[in-house]
Amino acid sequence: MGCLEMPRSPVPDFLGEPRPASNDAETMQPRAPAAVPPDARNGARVKAQNAAPQGVYRPNDNFLTPNMRSPEYVQMSTAAAITLGIMSGYMHRTSCTRCLNLLLTYPEGCRANCAYCGLARHREAERNYADRNFIRVDWPAIPYDQVIDIVASGGDGGRFHRMCISMITHPRSDEDTRVVLKKWVERVKHVPVSILSNPTTMTRLDVQELKGLGADIFTVALDACNREVFDRTRGSGVQSPHSWDKYWEILHAAAEIFGPERFGAHLIVGMGETDHDVLTQVQAIRDLGGHSHMFAFFPERGSLMDHLPPVPRPQWRRIQLARYLIDYCDHHLERMRFDASGALIDFGLPQSEIDAVIGDGVAFRTSGCPGKEANDISACDRPYGDSPPRDIASYPFRLNSKDIRKVRRQVDEGMSGASGCRGS
């Protein structure tokens, strides 16, 4: 489906409803995962049917899901498939994405059970892995050699500035990531590669090997902004194998092995943490030499949190701005002020400087790994991955004057809603 098409979903539409200043921990409780019938576990249905893959597979309830495995097959985001010319579609106010996001794929799927994720293990009873939505869109499966052939021959028109290999929690994921990376580096030397890692199955040696094979940037999807939210949404609270300590162990290894500016971590805002929690992680990652890649929580259809509200837009805007100040303006958390609830009430900078950053608009664009040009701080556009086009959270394009006026108003609302001032 095209990026503008909204998936049919039981997810409630919270837009326009009165909203609290932030999503508190008591509100943001995921449902408990239900038991999966034995005949649906570990991709049993797909393996029993054993339908042979025939080229590109687009998720479709009217067809048997083929038995596809990495490294021969990979899945890619809808935006990447449109950019590559594999799918037709329309993206609101943009014609392409500049990052080719690839996802490893197996009939068994991801063995983790993250509460906010459309790929989670608990969905085995409902949907085969290759048919699950992820970050709000379908991910068609494509022979990896076909992907490489298109990009290596210039079939993408030079639009991709980066490729990202997204690992999942699966016994083959580490080895297959190395295979996918090695083949890409050998054939597509002009597009650098990022690794979105799975720390749960990794060691320091794995990180070192990926660096040696030519990975340019290494990232960790920390996602949760404190230990409690992590455990509740992707650890023992939802029968998932991930550990806060293990994720930070691999993040520290990446900082040492890849070095400054060549590693980062994903953070999701709005899952029950405070502003102070988020920005504490942002500062910690920056102190190590890396960058934070921010996502606004938006309920994913089929996840254990699809009944919960998205992050309030005013809170999201103040976090986006504060994160940008820390990551790219040499600002520091210690200069900001927070109220007793942990809400940001003062950026700790003169109002004129804050206004200038808002007016530039870059702080409110999608954040991720950089592009090939020196001033391109994020090639990862992820069009509408954390919001519908009618209420954009992360802008996948340069903001125009109307967009700037809107985000400025939302920042003002965010600071007044937190009972504070915008600047010093």
Name every feature range the model reports, one short phrase each:
Residues 122-176, 189-206, 210-248, 291-293:
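Core AdoMet radical
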Residues 154, 184, 210, 254, ...:
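Generic structural signal for hydrophobic
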Residues 177-193, 242-260, 313-330:
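Alpha-helix-loop-beta-strand connector modules within alpha/beta enzyme cores
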Residues 196, 200, 236-237, 250-276, ...:
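Conserved strand-turn element in the central/C-terminal portion of the radical SAM core barrel
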